[in-house]
């Protein structure tokens, strides 16, 4: 179509074109929501240390099954497992995603979301995915701050809230080493001085190491955990794509856990082939590093399951060339038979598309003894599985330092009977009293789970 030079008709033409583009986007989103395949095996069959892995089911239109975000109405809350109770520790937050407990019991929360990206919404697929994420509650601007919450009277509810740090760049992971607080922004590992009991830090963060970012920054969250001696930081960095469709050169130092020297910022790959590792935790008995990983999409509701695994130095876990060890992903070209041959299967599978994000080992005494050494996991919930999976907090029992048994639901009810998401759990931590704290980025709440003594 050729536009005229008259001002008014041109504006009308542009407005008309935008209406058409919007209609096309709505139609594409509706088609995605109504089409796609469904799971062929029960979710339970794809969980554990010997999961069923059906054949890939690639479809022209990927499966989309969104739980629209609506938040919690007054007086409502998630449902705690028998023997537990839950209440709001803090509400009215701005997209709280990650948590860190300080030695004095104060709780840090990263109020954050994805940074703006030049390529957001480009093309029909990009526009549709942007629409999907907004509907799922992930479309809010980033507050770019870390807030401090304090329960001064010990009643299980935060009675003081302060902005500890602001002006950050999509912060996520936090780790305290002596008097230094490390923050993982979406593009850099930063550090600020910390004084015990401080409620505000005005010192400008100092750069420790630049992290993979760039114009795509597909998986933007960066988590960080310190070694026991404080000499090294371990940073979880997700991939820049689903299965390297942006080119393998865009994946440098991504889909990996990086090891950073605390004194000079020197950095190296600790382990690779982990599509989107998020939660990081040291096992309290063995001292091994563990992570939860979000696996790849668009080969069906049954594949590929997210997982929990110990992380070995120098190990390769398959992405993008294979999954669950040496199951080759035929979409990736050129293939790498040498890397596939070395790929390690994860220790424990959590289920397809559950979006496992939070990870915390229990090493306290409020909960019964059988929870000691086991893992609590925040499952943010699927957007591309029929039926949905995740949207809950689970506990994975451990024995002798390894997962042992089927996951137990600890906190459910995040999706209502109409299929709407009242909340979505993300980060999980154990507070100084031994209660479990859960960040809910759709409900804008931090939930506190306690055990009721008999």
What does each model-identified segment do?
Residues 160-179, 185-227:
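Asp-box/WD-like beta-propeller blade repeats and closely related beta-sheet repeat scaffolds
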Residues 90-92, 163-168, 208-216, 270-273, ...:
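Surface loop/turn motifs at the tips and blade-to-blade linkers of beta-strand repeat domains
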Residues 112, 186-188, 194, 238-240, ...:
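Short loop/turn segments immediately following the C-termini of beta-strands
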């Amino acid at each position: 179509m050729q536009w005229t030079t008259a001002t008014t008709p041109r504006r009308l033409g542009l407005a008309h074109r935008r209406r058409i583009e919007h209609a096309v986007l709505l139609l594409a989103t509706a088609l995605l929501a109504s089409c796609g395949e469904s799971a062929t095996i029960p979710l339970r069959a794809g969980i554990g240390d010997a999961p069923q892995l059906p054949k890939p089911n690639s479809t022209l239109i990927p499966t989309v099954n969104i739980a629209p975000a609506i938040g919690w109405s007054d007086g409502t809350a998630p449902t705690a497992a028998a023997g537990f109770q839950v209440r709001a520790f803090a509400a009215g937050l701005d997209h709280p995603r990650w948590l860190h407990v300080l030695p004095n019991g104060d709780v840090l929360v990263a109020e954050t979301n994805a940074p703006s990206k030049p390529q957001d919404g480009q093309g029909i697929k990009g526009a549709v995915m942007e629409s999907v994420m907004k509907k799922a509650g992930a479309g809010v601007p980033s507050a770019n701050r870390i807030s401090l919450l304090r329960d001064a009277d010990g009643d299980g509810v935060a009675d003081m809230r302060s902005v500890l740090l602001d002006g950050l760049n999509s912060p996520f992971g936090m780790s305290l080493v002596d008097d230094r607080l490390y923050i993982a922004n979406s593009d850099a590992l930063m550090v600020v001085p910390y004084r015990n009991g401080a409620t505000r830090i005005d010192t400008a963060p100092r750069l420790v190491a630049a992290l993979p970012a760039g114009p795509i920054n597909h998986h933007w969250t960066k988590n960080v955990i310190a070694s026991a001696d404080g000499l090294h930081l371990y940073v979880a960095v997700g991939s820049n794509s689903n299965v390297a469709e942006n080119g393998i050169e865009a994946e440098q130092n991504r889909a990996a856990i990086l090891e950073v020297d605390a004194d000079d910022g020197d950095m190296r790959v600790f382990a690779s082939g982990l599509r989107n590792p998020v939660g990081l935790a040291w096992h309290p008995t063995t001292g091994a590093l563990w992570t939860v990983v979000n696996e790849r999409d668009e080969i069906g509701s049954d594949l590929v399951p997210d997982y929990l695994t110990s992380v070995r130095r120098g190990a390769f876990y398959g992405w993008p060339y294979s999954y669950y060890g040496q199951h080759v992903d035929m979409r990736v070209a050129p293939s790498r038979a040498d890397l596939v041959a070395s790929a390690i299967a994860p220790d424990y599978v959590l289920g397809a598309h559950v979006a496992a994000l939070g990870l915390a080992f229990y090493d306290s005494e409020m909960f019964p003894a059988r929870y000691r050494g086991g893992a609590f996991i925040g499952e943010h919930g699927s957007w591309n599985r029929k039926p949905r999976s995740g949207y809950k907090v689970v506990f994975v029992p451990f024995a002798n330092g390894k997962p042992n048994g089927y996951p137990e639901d600890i906190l459910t009810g995040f999706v209502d009977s109409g299929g709407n998401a009242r909340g979505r759990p993300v980060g999980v931590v154990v507070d100084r009293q031994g209660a479990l704290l859960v960040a809910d980025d759709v409900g804008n709440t931090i939930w506190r789970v306690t055990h009721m003594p008999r």
